[in-house]
């Protein structure tokens, strides 16, 4: 909404100077005010939003061909991008640049490789953090290096199967997030479900810092948080695991997680980030039910079966056998000794008991009913 107001101010400023202004939608497949229910109200559930609202509406425009000629606007302004000093004075971002190549050309190349290799098993493969069945195009999409129209039609032209349909439905979730933000401008700070305003969140700075640093003692959580810190990105499966752990096992307000992701993600997107955190907390639109609490141990066993993801980001656990990799606190001492692991020293003890904290969360959420 604030961007709409900004654009209106720019248009008004230029109109006063007899400059014709035209604006075009290049960030979304559908404008958020276009997709609404028959009674004119916004959708609150994704499936009807996407299937009835989006897919029954005018199809998104196909990508335009590259212009053969650009008419350069002549201006007396002489500032360059470097003059704006957008980069930090202390170049902490250099380590992130090992994981990303900026620009449209690389985005197009990444998308082509995804269509050739990743999309064939996208529906199932996208759940495995160590595999490469996701496009990892979200930063390029966020910064406008690719448009959602290019992704939509690029996938559609690749053929028709359940994997392509599922990929397009994920773009639909992005549209749903923007619809929520458009209709709820305070999405990043205010519960969509007002009953959560009285939820008994716990303020625990020590646990919050441990979560941010990937030092919770729960390997699947720590791997996700370290991936975020080291690369500026986190696999979506991991986002759900670390989010559930924060708001349900630790009972820390979802807004703390939203702010941390906003500060650290290369693809930090106000609509997606806010809606995603409200979804995992259970207070958003079409949210996960309160009793859905991700068990990071079983999630690791199922979606990182060979332990590659955890071992990549938690090298201190590299020698721990798979049986105990996701729950090292259950390993016999001789197993930990052989793996050069000493809990509390080389790797933290868990900051919460998963079973006890789960029961505590269920009790807290039930109090809202």
Task: Name these PLM-found stretches.
Residues 1-61, 163, 226, 272, ...:
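Trp/Phe/Arg-rich N-terminal binding region typifying the photolyase-homology
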Residues 4, 10, 19, 28, ...:
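Weak global preference for isoleucine
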Residues 6, 28, 34-37, 50, ...:
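Short, isolated positions within intrinsically disordered regulatory regions of eukaryotic proteins
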Residues 9-10, 30-35, 56, 98, ...:
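Intrinsically disordered, low-complexity boundary segments flanking structured domains
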Residues 28-31, 90, 98, 199, ...:
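Short, low-complexity intrinsically disordered segments
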Residues 41-195, 304, 308-369:
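Glycine/tryptophan-enriched, flexible segments
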Residues 128, 132-322:
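Active-site-proximal binding-pocket segments
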